[in-house]
């Protein structure tokens, strides 16, 4: 009764893509996919086919383009390939409910970063513009230090590690900020910060985060053989006082683990990398909504110390309960391979998604 009581809401793909007993499974209950784009013709073609299937299956996609070689007299660079994704998103819908959606990620050190930053500005060569996509820039600690010190910043081709150009870091930063002012994007993704937060067992396996997903609420490793998967749902913080000290959080973690298992069992070979990643890491994304409603209901100023204390209290409670249930699931069903030796079933547990539809 948690959903009917307004204590939590399913993510849209969980709610809309659950098949009826007699219905064939077409779309899947997964909100987020994170893909890696290799620097090869085979990899680019595979990525194009995979993201079409992922979109049809019902999920939004984040694509990580930082390793694709820069434009040269022998290579077109990543932008024309990203443009094909732009066209795909108008054709391949997310399951039954909404059009395809995609966010491209690129490192701040890539030689094509300026063109990438400007790809949503509707002037210039239309064949290299991408008005139907979202985009994000991976910002490193070294770049921010270069901005702080007003140093030059090297743009390095990922193919041969040669320096293609050197530009004032502050000039690039100004372009980022101006583009955000004009278009609302790119997202700012602090790539070193998220890699430091990766579970140690995953670091020990040589795994690395190359970017995030469509909505930037979760960071998971991607590689040639891994397309990361995360299934979402969110609790309603407005009714926190009603559901705290109930078994709801633990029940929801168990529920999402079951949803992930449904995906693993029904994902076809056309999205085998996503199925493999889900089996290895079993990432969940239990989120939250209604924080402003809780504060308004209790007449707590948004920026007050009381609000900060309550925020810490609530999310500490959610995290603690989630970890307890993941440990319990590991005892019952086994650890996932990426968390072997930790006593946990899931490598990730919490993710605060946008909740546009869920909030309604």
Walk through the language-model features, giving the residues of each.
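Extended catalytic cores of very large enzyme megasubunits
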Residues: 1-360
């Amino acid at each position: 009764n948690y959903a009917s009581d307004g204590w939590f809401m399913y993510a849209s793909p969980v709610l809309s893509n659950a098949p009826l007993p007699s219905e064939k499974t077409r779309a899947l209950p997964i909100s987020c996919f994170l893909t890696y784009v290799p620097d090869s013709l085979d990899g680019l073609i595979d990525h194009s086919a995979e993201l079409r299937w992922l979109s049809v299956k019902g999920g939004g996609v984040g694509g990580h383009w930082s390793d694709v070689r820069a434009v040269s007299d022998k290579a077109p660079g990543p932008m024309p390939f990203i443009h094909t994704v732009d066209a795909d998103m108008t054709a391949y819908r997310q399951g039954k409910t909404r059009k395809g959606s995609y966010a491209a990620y690129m490192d701040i050190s890539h030689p094509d970063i300026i063109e990438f930053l400007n790809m949503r500005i509707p002037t210039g060569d239309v064949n290299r513009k991408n008005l139907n996509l979202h985009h994000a820039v991976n910002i490193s600690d070294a770049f921010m230090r270069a901005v702080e010190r007003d140093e030059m910043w090297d743009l390095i081709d990922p193919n041969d590690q040669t320096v293609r150009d050197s530009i004032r870091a502050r000039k690039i930063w100004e372009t980022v900020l101006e583009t955000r002012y004009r278009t609302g994007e790119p997202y700012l993704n602090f790539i070193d910060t998220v890699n430091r937060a990766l579970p140690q067992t995953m670091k020990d396996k040589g795994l690395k985060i190359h970017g995030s997903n469509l909505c930037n609420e979760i960071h998971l490793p991607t590689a040639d053989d891994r397309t990361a998967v995360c299934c979402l749902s969110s609790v309603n913080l407005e009714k926190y006082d009603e559901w705290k000290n109930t078994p709801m959080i633990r029940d929801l973690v168990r529920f999402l683990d079951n949803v992930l298992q449904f995906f693993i069992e029904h994902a076809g070979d056309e999205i085998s990398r996503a199925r493999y990643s889900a089996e290895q890491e079993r990432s969940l994304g239990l989120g939250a909504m209604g924080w402003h409603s809780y504060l308004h209901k209790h007449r707590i100023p948004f920026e007050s110390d009381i609000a900060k204390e309550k925020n810490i209290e609530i999310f500490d409670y959610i995290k603690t309960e989630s970890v307890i249930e993941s440990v319990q699931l590991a005892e019952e069903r086994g650890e996932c391979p990426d968390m072997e030796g930790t006593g946990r079933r899931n490598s990730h547990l919490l993710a605060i998604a946008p909740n546009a539809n869920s909030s309604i």
